[in-house]
Amino acid sequence: MKKILVLNGPNINMLGIREKNVYGTATYDDLCEMIRKKAEELQIEVEIEQSNSEGQLVDWIQICHNKVDGIVINPGAYTHYSVAILDALKSVNIPAVEVHISNIHQREAFRHHCVTTAGCTGQICGLGLQGYMLALEYLAGK
């Protein structure tokens, strides 16, 4: 059975509370439940983690080397400047899909530049929580 690591960066735990006009009303628990149900449907195993700490995200990426078949990552604000997360993604050589709930390319100019995406197979943005499901489908098929 394939195993996928789902990593969520800073403030994703605040879904349903912060900027509902941008991120919607679903909570982080709702997102995790959606991911678990999708994993069951796809017959894959998922591990879901969230941290506001860049170093913790790097640690989880490194730990999963040779242990998972894919990574779904929403680096949050770290997307725009974390060379550490980029380097970690590149070092483990695991297919990764970067997900953003909002369309970061239609938001503030500083959000248009994505550093971490270069370490990923692809990026899904602007499709709400459905982006996570699409990423899981893609990685389950690899």
Q: Which residues are covered by each model-predicted region?
A:
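Short acidic/histidine-rich motifs immediately flanking catalytic phosphotransfer sites
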Residues: 64-71
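Short acidic active-site motifs
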Residues: 56-60
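Short beta->alpha junction loops
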Residues: 47-55
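Extreme N-terminal starter segment of soluble prokaryotic enzymes
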Residues: 1-4
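Glycine- and acidic-residue-enriched helix-capping/strand-helix junction motifs
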Residues: 15-29
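Helix-loop-strand module that forms the ligand-binding subsite of alpha/beta enzymes
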Residues: 73-111
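Short, glycine-/small-residue-rich phosphate/pyrophosphate-handling segment
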Residues: 97, 105-142
